[in-house]
Amino acid sequence: TTGWAYYDESKEDAWNRSVEMMRKVCDYAKANDILVAIEALQPNESVLANSVEQLKAYLDAVNHPQLKVCIDFGAMARVNNTIQDYFDAFGKDVIHTHFVDGKPTGHLAWSDGTRDLKQDLLDLEANGYDGYLSLESVNSRYYEKPWEAEEKTLSAFDQLETK
């Protein structure tokens, strides 16, 4: 992620520090033949990149071929961005997805939120996405029984196959 600003630090200083550090991370990644995927965060998680527009500005500032994009469905929904917004801005640089349900946010298991699972999959497919879908169900409701989130998500996928 882009990180956060220190409480006594300007957003500009935090941005510059983050960009400089991300270039170092990407240089290391290049030397080891790996890619780095970065996500926008929700406004309560970071002050640096919360939207497609801000994430695009960040990637432009870092300007490194190893830096790619992860769509986080929670952050995306929080600022009313769409899957299509991400592909319009980043195209094939979208290499990973935190594929979760939400109301509109919440990092919920599929079927616990209000997102349209089938339509989201169709939108990814329409854009030629062939990357991974990480199930990032990190809501406190799953802390005691985390497997329930996976079971709900698998059930939601199974229901798609029977329709």
Please state what every model-predicted region is.
Residues 39-41, 74, 138:
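Short loop/turn motifs enriched for small/polar and acidic residues
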Residues 1-69, 78:
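Active-site acidic/histidine proton-transfer and metal-coordination neighborhood
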Residues 49-70, 77-163:
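Histidine-acidic metal/acid-base catalytic patches
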